[in-house]
């Protein structure tokens, strides 16, 4: 069975927040090849919050920190403030150690630097999906 499929046979559902359409499509292709189901794309933080409100049972969110309108950092805390934090993997060019440490300490599952590499995406996302989200 592919890593993107739960033991009950249901694909794990993913939301992608990415300011580059090309990168979002690339990320979706990588995840879908492993059985994940991408259920939505957001090009800015406000769109992601709206999508999250519509899909509260999403299994995982990939979050770029360099989003327009509402950046990924603010978006993370907006979603966290809604209750149970879903699994969130940061996929970003942002690499300030203090920022990343804070997000991990606050419940983000992992960080993947850009440019994205298929092996690294699958390694980190597959590991995150096995973890229980932090409350």
Swiss-Prot record:
- InterPro entries in the record, alphabetically? CheY-like_superfamily (IPR011006), Sig_transdc_resp-reg_receiver (IPR001789), ST_Response_Regulator (IPR052048)
Outline the extent of the Response regulatory domain: 13-129
Q: Which residues form a coiled coil?
A: none
Q: Which Pfam families match?
A: Response_reg (PF00072)
At the top level, the lineage of the source is Bacteria
Any GO BP: phosphorelay signal transduction system
Keyword annotations = Phosphoprotein
4-aspartylphosphate occurs at which residues?
Answer: 64
Its name, as the record gives it, is Uncharacterized protein LIC_11769
* Species of provenance: Leptospira interrogans serogroup Icterohaemorrhagiae serovar copenhageni (strain Fiocruz L1-130)
